[in-house]
Design a protein with these regions (language model features):
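Positively charged n-region of N-terminal signal peptides that target proteins for export
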Residues: 1-4
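Bacterial N-terminal signal peptides
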Residues: 6-16
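Serine-esterase "nucleophile elbow" of acetyl-processing enzymes
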Residues: 19-69, 73-76, 84, 94-102, ...
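Conserved catalytic region of serine esterases and O-acyltransferases that act on ester linkages
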Residues: 26, 42, 182, 204-313
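Oxyanion-hole/transition-state-stabilizing segment in secreted/luminal serine hydrolases
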Residues: 33, 45, 74-77, 84-126, ...
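Solvent-exposed loop/turn segments at secondary-structure junctions
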Residues: 36-39, 67-73, 105, 112-117, ...
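A short helix->loop->beta-strand "cap" motif at the edges of active sites that frequently abuts
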Residues: 140-145
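Substrate-gating cap/lid alpha-helix
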Residues: 156-191
Length: 313
C-alpha cells in the first residue's frame, strides 16, 4: 500500500503551473551551480540519463560545479565544519567557472546553507537576496539562459534546527516572486518536495509510525528526493514525458541497455565534477583532487562512445 501511495504522490507532484520551455537545439553545455546537494549530483545524473535516452541524436554536456558548504550570501556560522574552515562563497570562483565553461544554460540552486541553519533574520535574508541578485545579473550578462532553482525542503524532524524549514519557505517564496517582479526564470523544487514530504508524514501519523525521510539527515536528499528535483527541472525544460515516471530507473527500463547507460552516465558525472572543480579552483579544503581536465575529457569521450553504442543496440 505504501508503494502505491508513493507512486501516486510522485505522479501528482507534476505541477499544472509549469510552462514547458523546450530546450533549444543550439544548447550544448548546461552548467549546474549549488552546494553539497548539487555536488552529490544524483539529480544531474538522472536528468542527463533521461535526456540521453529521449534525445540520442543530441550531444549535451551536463556540467556539475556544485561545491559542498557553499553559499551566495557569504555567511558562515561560528564553528562550521567543527571549526576547520568557513563556508566557501560563490563570489570567489564564479568568474573562473564562467570563463572555463561558457555555458548555454545555467541552473543555480542556493539557499539551504545561506540562512546558516538559524531562525529567520532580516539581515541574513537580505544577504541572500543580494547574493542571488548578484548571481542572476552576472549570469545574464554572459548571454546564457539562467534558471534559478528554489532550495530543497528542510526536514526539521530529521535535522533538528527548529524553524529553519520556515526560513527556506521564505527564501523559496522570494525567488518565486522574482518570476513576476523581475522576470526571472525560476524552477520550483522546494514545494514539490515539501508536498511529497508532508504527504508521507500524514501517512506515517495515520499508522502511528515515524519511518519516512526524504533526507536521512534532513538536508541531503536520498534517491527519491533527487528524482523529484530532476523531474521538476526536466519538466521545466519541456520534457513533458517525465511527468509519468516514478523514478529514473522506470525511464531507463524503456531501453534494453538502459541500466548500462545510467551506470555510464553516473560514472562520467562522478569524475568530471571533480575534474572541473580542480581545474577552476575553490577555497574549500577536504575535497577530492580531480583528474587533469584534458585527461578527464578524453575519458569522458570514451564513455560517450560506449553510451552511443548501447543506444544503437
Amino acid at each position: 500500500m505504501k508503494y502505491l501511495f508513493t507512486a501516486t504522490i510522485l505522479v501528482l507532484l507534476t505541477p499544472a503551473g509549469i510552462i514547458a520551455q523546450t530546450m533549444d537545439t543550439g544548447v550544448h553545455k548546461i552548467l549546474f551551480l549549488g552546494n553539497s546537494i548539487t555536488y552529490a549530483g544524483n539529480y544531474i545524473t538522472d536528468m542527463e540519463a533521461a535526456y540521453t535516452l529521449w534525445h540520442p541524436e543530441r550531444r549535451v554536456s551536463f556540467i556539475n560545479m556544485g561545491l559542498p558548504s557553499e553559499t551566495v550570501s557569504g555567511l558562515s556560522e561560528e564553528g562550521h565544519a567543527g571549526g576547520r574552515f568557513p563556508r566557501p562563497d560563490l563570489h570567489e570562483r564564479l568568474h573562473r567557472i564562467l570563463k572555463a565553461v561558457q555555458p548555454d544554460i545555467v541552473f543555480a540552486c542556493y539557499g539551504m546553507n545561506d540562512g546558516i541553519y538559524l531562525p529567520f533574520d532580516q539581515q541574513r535574508f537580505q544577504r541572500y537576496k543580494d547574493g542571488m541578485n548578484w548571481l542572476h545579473d552576472t549570469l545574464v550578462k554572459t548571454g546564457a539562459r539562467v534558471i534559478i532553482v528554489t532550495p530543497p525542503v528542510y526536514d526539521e524532524l530529521r535535522a533538528g534546527a527548529t524553524g529553519y524549514g520556515a526560513v527556506l519557505d521564505k527564501y523559496a517564496d522570494w525567488l518565486r516572486l522574482q518570476k513576476k517582479s523581475a522576470h526571472w526564470e525560476v524552477a520550483d523544487i522546494h514545494y514539490p518536495m515539501k508536498k511529497y514530504l508532508d504527504a508521507h508524514r500524514t501517512l506515517d501519523a495515520a499508522y502511528g509510525v515515524d519511518g519516512f525521510a526524504l533526507a536521512a539527515d534532513g538536508v541531503h536528499p536520498g534517491e527519491a528526493g533527487h528524482w523529484i528535483m530532476a523531474k521538476q527541472l526536466l519538466l521545466y525544460l519541456g520534457e513533458k514525458k517525465a511527468a509519468g515516471y516514478q523514478g529514473i530507473k522506470n525511464i531507463m527500463e524503456q531501453h534494453s541497455n538502459g541500466a548500462g547507460i545510467l551506470q555510464l552516465v553516473a560514472e562520467r558525472q562522478n569524475f568530471m565534477k571533480d575534474a572541473w572543480l580542480t581545474a577552476t579552483g575553490h577555497t574549500r579544503p577536504e575535497m577530492k583532487t580531480g583528474l587533469p581536465l584534458q585527461e578527464a575529457n578524453t575519458r569522458a569521450l570514451e564513455i560517450g562512445r560506449k553510451i552511443t553504442a548501447l543506444l544503437q543496440q
